[in-house]
Design a protein with these regions (language model features):
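Conserved NAD(P)H cofactor-binding loop of Rossmann-fold oxidoreductase domains
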Residues: 71-74, 107-109
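Rossmann-fold scaffold of SDR-type NAD(P)-dependent oxidoreductases
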Residues: 9, 64-70, 105
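Active-site Tyr-X1-5-Lys
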Residues: 129-146
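Conserved Rossmann-fold cofactor-binding substructure of NAD(P)-dependent oxidoreductases
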Residues: 45-65
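N-terminal Rossmann-fold cofactor-binding loop
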Residues: 33-38, 51
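N-terminal Rossmann NAD(P)H-binding glycine-rich loop of SDR-like oxidoreductase domains
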Residues: 4-26
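Conserved Rossmann-fold NAD(P)-dependent oxidoreductase catalytic core, especially the SDR/UDP-sugar
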Residues: 86-132
Length: 146
């Protein structure tokens, strides 16, 4: 059976906006979770709240098939841990209790940090250099747990 409901966090960001457009073009029912109010758009069901609100997350993910986690704090250092790490942990915890078929976590190439290697792989040792990179790396470790 083909997936019908796709959820996107971080839909006001560059990757999230494009993800939403593509999912709508594919005929999916799209749900968007945003901290800030967004303008209503055809084909999108809006959920306002943050990644730490379990009640909203449960409603957001109810009967969903796909989740694209594009949200992340890139500017305000004091919010990075709560959004990028704690928010991801909360979202992932709720998602694991649903019937999602697909969970896509968007991270950052920056988690690798500085390297002299020409190519990086899954086995490359990560050495994040700043708070954003560190928090995105911590989030990667959370979602890679079984």
């Amino acid at each position: 059976m083909e997936s019908k409901i796709a959820c996107v966090t971080g839909a006001s960001g560059l990757i999230g906006k494009e993800m939403v457009k593509e999912l709508i073009a594919q005929g999916k029912e799209v749900r968007v979770l945003s901290r800030k109010p967004l303008e209503p758009q055809q084909g999108i069901r809006l959920f306002q709240g943050d990644l730490l609100n379990v009640k909203i997350l449960k409603a957001f993910l109810f009967e969903a098939d796909h989740l694209f986690h594009c949200a992340g704090e890139i500017q305000r250092q004091e919010k990075m841990k709560s959004t990028n790490v704690d928010g991801t942990k909360c979202l992932f915890g709720v998602a694991r209790k649903t019937h999602l078929k697909y969970f896509c976590h968007i991270s950052s190439a920056g988690v690798v940090g500085k390297t002299d290697q020409k190519w990086v792989t899954e086995e490359t040792v990560c050495n994040p250099q700043n708070e954003y990179e560190r928090t995105k790396y911590e989030a990667e470790k959370i979602v890679s747990q079984k």
